Design a protein with these regions (language model features):
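Long, aromatic- and glycine/proline-rich binding clefts that accommodate carbohydrate-like moieties
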Residues: 200, 250-293
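A local structural motif
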Residues: 68-73, 137-153, 166, 190-196
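Glycine-centered hinge/linker elements that transmit conformational signals in sensory
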Residues: 85, 121-152, 202
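A structural signal for short loop-to-beta-strand junctions that line the ligand-binding cleft
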Residues: 25-62, 96-99, 203-213, 286-293
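Alpha-to-beta junction loops
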Residues: 1, 14-16, 164-172
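Short helix-initiation/N-cap motifs at beta->coil->alpha
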Residues: 3-4, 76-82, 149-164
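Hinge/lid segment of periplasmic solute-binding proteins
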Residues: 2-54, 194, 198-200, 272, ...
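Extracytoplasmic/periplasmic substrate-recognition and gating elements
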Residues: 67, 185-255
C-alpha cells in the first residue's frame, strides 16, 4: 500500500509488527535511505517498502548545447538551479525557451522545502515554504517558467511540456524515465525535440546533502490475521530486499533499495542516457516522503 493506505491499516490494528522479524533476518534499514524511519509508528515498523519513486531533474541537452551552457551537476543548490534556469531562458516571442518547468502539483513547488530534513507537510506552520514560492513566482514574472494559471487553464501535461523541446529543465518523478524512453521509441515524442535528454540530482537547500530528494513508496506488510506469518514475512523480505530489487529494476521499476546492481540495470536500459552523470544521478542519499506517516 501507499502511505495513506498503510496509515489506515495500522490504525485499524490489522498489520503485524515487523520489528522482531527484521531483527532476526538481520535487515539493515539504513539501506532504505531513511524511508523506514518515516513510516515507523510509536517505535514499530509494520511494512517494508519495495518500490520507491523519487524526484529528479530532467533536462534537454540540445537546449543547453544551443545556449553553450554546461549540463546541470548532481550537486545544485536552489540558488544554483534558479540561476541556471535564468541563463537558459529566451523570452523572444515565437522562439521562447523556458529555463524550467513546474507541473501544477503542489509537490513540484513546496516540497523543495522538506529536503533539509527539518520540515514536513504535517508541520501546521508553513512559513518554510515561502522562499520556494517566492522563487518560482519570480521565475513566472520573468518568463523563466510558464505560469500556474496558464498551465491550469491549458491543462498542459508535464510530459507534453517537456516533449515540446522548449523546456530546458523539469523536476519530475523517476516514473517519467520509462515514459520518456517508451514514447521516444514508439515515435509518440519527436526525437528531434526531446530525444537528447539527461537527468540530474534534485536541487537542494543550502546545507542539505547532495542527492537528497522527495519520494513516494509502496510497501508490503503481514496481516495480523495471517495463519502463516513467517512465510508471509519471507515473501516481504525477498521482494523488498536486494534480490527483489533486481527483479523490479529489470522491469523498469524503481525499487526501494538502490544497489549498484540496480543502478547498473536501470542505466543499462535501452534509451537511458549514456552519460555517466545521468547514471550517477540515480544515487540518492536521503529520501523524504511526500506524505509522511
Amino acid at each position: 500500500k501507499d502511505v495513506p493506505g498503510y496509515a489506515t491499516l495500522v490504525q485499524k490494528n490489522t498489520l503485524e509488527s515487523l520489528d522482531d522479524y527484521i531483527t532476526d533476518a538481520g535487515i539493515n534499514l539504513a539501506d532504505f535511505n531513511g524511508i523506514t524511519d518515516q513510516v515507523t509508528v510509536d517505535g514499530s515498523l509494520y511494512e517494508l517498502p519495495f518500490r520507491s519513486d523519487y524526484w529528479l531533474i530532467y533536462y534537454n541537452k540540445d537546449v543547453f548545447d544551443a545556449a553553450g551552457i554546461a549540463y546541470p551537476s548532481n550537486d545544485m543548490t536552489m540558488e544554483d538551479y534558479d540561476a541556471l534556469a535564468r541563463q537558459l531562458t529566451d523570452t523572444t516571442y515565437g522562439s521562447q525557451v523556458y529555463g524550467c518547468h513546474y507541473h501544477t502539483w503542489r509537490s513540484a513547488v513546496e516540497l523543495f522545502g522538506i529536503l533539509d530534513g527539518k520540515h514536513s507537510i504535517l508541520d501546521g506552520n508553513y512559513d518554510w515554504m515561502i522562499p520556494y514560492y517566492d522563487m518560482i513566482l519570480s521565475e513566472e514574472d520573468d518568463g523563466v517558467c510558464q505560469t500556474y494559471t496558464d498551465l491550469s487553464t491549458e491543462g498542459l501535461h508535464y510530459s507534453a511540456a517537456f516533449s515540446n523541446g522548449n523546456v530546458a529543465m523539469m523536476n519530475m518523478g523517476s516514473w517519467f524515465i520509462s515514459t520518456l524512453i517508451s514514447n521516444l521509441d514508439s515515435g509518440e515524442y519527436d526525437s528531434s525535440l526531446c530525444g537528447n535528454w539527461g537527468i540530474a540530482s534534485y536541487p537542494h537547500p543550502d546545507g542539505a546533502e547532495a542527492g537528497s530528494t522527495i519520494a513516494t513508496i509502496t510497501g508490503l506488510a503481514v496481516t495480523s490475521a495471517s495463519a502463516n506469518k513467517d512465510a508471509a514475512f519471507d515473501f516481504v523480505n525477498w521482494v523488498s530486499g536486494t534480490e527483489g530489487a533486481k527483479v523490479m529494476a529489470s522491469t523498469g521499476n524503481f525499487p526501494a533499495i538502490m544497489t549498484d546492481d540496480v543502478i547498473n540495470t536501470i542505466a543499462g536500459m535501452a534509451g537511458f542516457p549514456t552519460d555517466e552523470s545521468s547514471k550517477e544521478a540515480l544515487n540518492i542519499t536521503n529520501a523524504y516522503l511526500e506524505v509522511p506517516y
